[in-house]
């Protein structure tokens, strides 16, 4: 039998569609209907219809009559209402398709009806909203803008999926624009596109130099446009504006899926075996939104200037040449979109001597002001100003002024509003704060200590640091600036509440857990407080004049020190089946390999960073979608269940990452300083209480095979890449379940991921959460993270200074290494783009 569709086309009759519609009608009135009854009703319909062909309406009319003839009046009524509703939806769909009049748009609307069948996503609602924005003589682009705006405005906490519908319209609009640009340039295949982009210096020539045409065509077959449906409107809007390749005049030249494939091609470029398999695995993990790479990797992979690293950390030495070199290093890093951490703990304090002249030194503040001006001046091609965190030790003589760098009162000549201050705390400071805030606290100049004692106090930690610090305090030859612990705490908390900073770095906790303590010390962290790796200042060796072949040159020789660089990626926990151990291990293994490849493929803005990165081969695998993961499993943030669950999850992630790194070491070789490390001795595993047979087996494997990477895990804030993946940022709880954000004249819906009746109450707002649970959870996770975590504290106006201090003390007692922002409810803070993995 043939069926005549409303469009006039015919198709084969399918009785299953009729039984499905009748079943829904029975369900809608709360009646159960056995399959044999449905089959009998269908048989009656078919007998009464005869051979056909029949229109859809004629078949539906017959279904109504048969239902009533068999006494199912309520069911028939429901079926009639169902038909009426379908007619309304069809009418709305036809009106919308007629408004756009572009090929393929009707299919988009049909898919939306199929994928979002709930009443609150009816196209008649969209049409009614769209009609209010519609005007005569609109272009296709303007009509689609109106449709997108309508879908965005329909997005609410009760109907959150409209943000996915808005994304589909945006993607369709982008596709039309892209198709025009490709046609104009005569681009057909993916290979043609790469050839064109390479010729225009928008793609790195290295891609086509490494891959054959056949391999590019094989890669093109990996593309899955259906994965565009995973984007929310906010995520797709961000990706199209910031990440896809555009011409020098802003014309789009790459689809979202081609962007992910281009990144995968770059990251797998140097694989010796099964290279195309790795291309597919890298593409799949990115396009399925199970993993996000850091913002510089997403932006710059596949391009001529492929600076893929997020953050850099430099130790500022105590000499004029070294200070200006560090500032220049920051400028070079900022130029290519990286963020910086600068450790100023070695720089002499205000009033210290220079070449024996007492009182000549101007202190760290004037140098930090130069860093501040550099951040403003080197603004990444006018896109955004540079970002830098400046770290100072809690015993440094300039600390009181340092803690007022960003506050609103005081001498403006001593301010630096565009840097992010951070303080490095020894255990002794917190011990005294816990015991009695009136304890004396002695501030010292590092140059005075070095001159009198012959050692740098900051080069030690733990009990040895405390012994030497107290010895310096007792030594009358060393000038001191004596305050109380309360004085420092008051300045810290005042600045934290006003500005969100200083960040906190618990140096003894960090260095005790350092798996590479045999090679040095960790002075500070990076811009986003998640990196903790060995550091050493760059040293000038000599400057000489050389003449040869009629030319004179000045040659400066330096020792590279250890300038830290971090390559980041994040597991999107909300999109991963974290309970599936084999799936998690395979995914972690894939992303660890990708990050390890970044080290060799990277364009380094500084030669010092290249040397450190290739010696240590450090990576920073983190997570995003943490609150998303908890909510979709019905786990309350403020619960012991939360702590127990994440303890297991992060232990499995750590196990998988270590296993991946040791297997890479077996395949490609271990990092330079493995011998003598905690990895090699087994101390890493003992310190963390990893004593199960499974862990002992892994420890033995590591000792035998080595580790490819000196450092593995670091949890970045992921402020922008979490938007791309449609998940919650980093380890943070959500700010609100739903809100509309205005950006450059347009409204962006922000909805908690998978918001529904089931998840609603598990999405508690960050400022309403008891922060002690957040700190305790951070302590639980920290055992499994060899570096650190970007963790924010959320406070309200009801918090007393004592309560905020208690959170810092709890963090220290819980083994938390760093604290990022203190987010007061009324405070707006600037996010780091570079670490947004």
What kind of feature is each model-predicted range?
Residues 65-68, 138, 153, 231-241, ...:
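Core structural elements
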Residues 141, 146, 177-182, 230-232, ...:
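Long, structured ligand/cofactor-binding scaffold of large enzymes
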Residues 251-321, 468-495, 499-504, 649-700:
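Gly/Pro-rich turn-and-neighbor structural signature
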Residues 172-226, 309-560, 564-570, 577-578, ...:
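Active-site cavity-forming subdomains of large catalytic enzyme subunits
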Residues 9, 32-261, 277-283:
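Core nucleic-acid recognition elements
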Residues 212-220, 224, 228-237, 529-533, ...:
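Catalytic alpha/beta core of large soluble enzyme barrels
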Residues 285, 303, 327, 587-610, ...:
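Internal maturation/activation junctions in enzymes
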Residues 78-79, 83-88, 162-194, 425, ...:
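Terminal amphipathic helices with adjacent charged low-complexity linkers/tails
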């Amino acid at each position: 039998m043939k069926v005549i569709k409303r469009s006039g086309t015919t198709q084969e009759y399918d009785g299953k569609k009729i039984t499905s519609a009748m079943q829904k009608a029975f369900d809608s009135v709360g009646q159960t209907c056995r399959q044999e009854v449905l089959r009998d009703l269908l048989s009656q319909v078919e007998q009464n219809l005869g051979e056909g062909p029949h229109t859809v309406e004629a078949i539906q009319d017959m279904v109504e009559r048969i239902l009533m003839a068999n006494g199912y009046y309520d069911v028939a009524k429901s079926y009639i209402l169902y038909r009426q509703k379908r007619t309304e939806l069809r009418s709305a769909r036809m009106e919308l398709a007629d408004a756009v009049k572009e090929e393929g748009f009707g299919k988009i609307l049909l898919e939306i009806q199929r994928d979002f069948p709930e009443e609150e996503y009816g196209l008649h609602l969209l049409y009614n909203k769209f009609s209010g924005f519609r005007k005569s003589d609109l272009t296709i682009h303007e009509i689609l803008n109106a449709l997108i705006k309508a879908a965005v405005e329909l997005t609410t906490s009760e109907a959150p999926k409209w943000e996915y519908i808005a994304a589909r319209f945006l993607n369709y609009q982008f596709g039309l624009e892209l198709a025009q640009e490709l046609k104009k340039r005569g681009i057909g295949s993916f290979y043609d596109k790469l050839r064109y982009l390479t010729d225009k210096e928008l793609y790195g020539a290295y891609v086509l130099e490494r891959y054959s045409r056949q391999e590019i065509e094989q890669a093109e077959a990996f593309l899955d446009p259906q994965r565009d449906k995973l984007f929310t409107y906010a995520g797709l809007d961000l990706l199209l504006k910031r990440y896809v390749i555009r011409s020098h005049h802003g014309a789009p030249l790459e689809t979202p899926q081609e962007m992910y494939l281009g990144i995968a091609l770059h990251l797998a470029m140097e694989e010796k075996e099964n290279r195309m398999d790795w291309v597919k695995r890298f593409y799949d993990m990115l396009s399925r939104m199970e993993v996000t790479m850091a913002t510089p990797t997403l932006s710059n992979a596949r391009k001529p200037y492929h600076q893929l690293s997020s953050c850099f950390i430099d130790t500022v030495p105590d000499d004029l040449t070294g200070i200006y070199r560090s500032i220049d290093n920051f400028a070079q890093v900022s130029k290519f979109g990286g963020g910086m951490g600068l450790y100023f703990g070695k720089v002499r304090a205000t009033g210290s001597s220079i070449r024996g002249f007492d009182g000549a030194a101007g202190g760290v503040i004037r140098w930090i002001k130069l860093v501040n001006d550099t951040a403003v001046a080197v603004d990444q091609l006018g896109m955004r100003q540079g970002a830098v965190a400046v770290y100072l030790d809690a015993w440094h003589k300039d600390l009181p002024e340092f803690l007022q760098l960003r506050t609103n009162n005081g001498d403006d000549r001593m301010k630096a509003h565009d840097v992010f201050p951070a303080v490095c705390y020894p255990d002794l400071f917190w011990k005294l704060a816990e015991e009695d805030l009136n304890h004396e606290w002695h501030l010292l100049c590092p140059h005075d200590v070095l001159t009198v004692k012959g050692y740098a106090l900051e080069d030690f930690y733990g009990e040895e640091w405390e012994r030497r610090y107290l010895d310096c305090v007792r030594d009358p030859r060393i000038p001191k600036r004596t305050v109380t612990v309360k004085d420092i705490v008051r300045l810290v908390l005042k600045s934290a509440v006003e500005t969100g900073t200083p960040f906190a770095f618990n140096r003894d906790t960090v260095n005790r857990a350092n798996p590479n303590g045999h090679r040095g010390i960790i002075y500070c962290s990076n811009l986003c407080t998640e990196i903790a790796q060995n550091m050493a200042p760059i040293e000038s060796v000599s400057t000489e004049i050389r003449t040869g072949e009629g030319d004179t040159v000045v040659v400066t020789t330096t020792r590279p020190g250890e300038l830290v660089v971090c390559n980041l990626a994040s597991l999107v926990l909300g999109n991963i089946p974290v309970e599936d151990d084999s799936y998690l291990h395979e995914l972690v293994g894939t992303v660890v390999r990708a990050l390890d490849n970044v080290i060799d493929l990277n364009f380094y803005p500084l030669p010092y960073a290249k040397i450190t990165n290739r010696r240590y081969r450090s990576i920073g695998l983190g997570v995003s979608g943490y609150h998303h993961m908890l909510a979709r499993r019905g786990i309350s943030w403020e619960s012991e269940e939360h702590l127990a669950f994440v303890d297991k999850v992060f232990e499995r992630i750590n196990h998988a990452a270590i296993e991946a790194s040791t297997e890479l070491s077996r395949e490609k070789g271990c990092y330079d300083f493995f011998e003598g490390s905690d990895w090699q001795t087994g101390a890493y595993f003992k310190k963390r209480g990893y004593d199960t047979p499974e862990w002992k087996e892994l420890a033995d494997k590591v000792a035998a095979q080595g580790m490819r990477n000196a450092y593995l895990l670091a949890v970045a804030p992921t402020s922008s890449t979490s938007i791309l993946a449609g998940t919650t940022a980093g380890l943070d709880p959500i700010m609100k379940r739903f809100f509309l954000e205005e950006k450059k004249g347009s409204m962006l819906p922000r909805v908690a991921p998978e918001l529904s009746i089931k998840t609603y109450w598990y999405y508690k707002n960050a400022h309403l959460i008891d922060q002690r649970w957040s700190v305790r959870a951070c302590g639980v996770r920290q055992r499994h993270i060899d570096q650190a975590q970007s963790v924010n504290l959320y406070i309200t106006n009801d918090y007393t200074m004592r309560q905020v201090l208690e959170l810092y003390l709890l963090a220290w007692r819980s083994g938390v290494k760093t604290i990022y922002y203190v987010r007061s409810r009324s405070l707006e803070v600037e996010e780091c783009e570079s670490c947004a993995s």
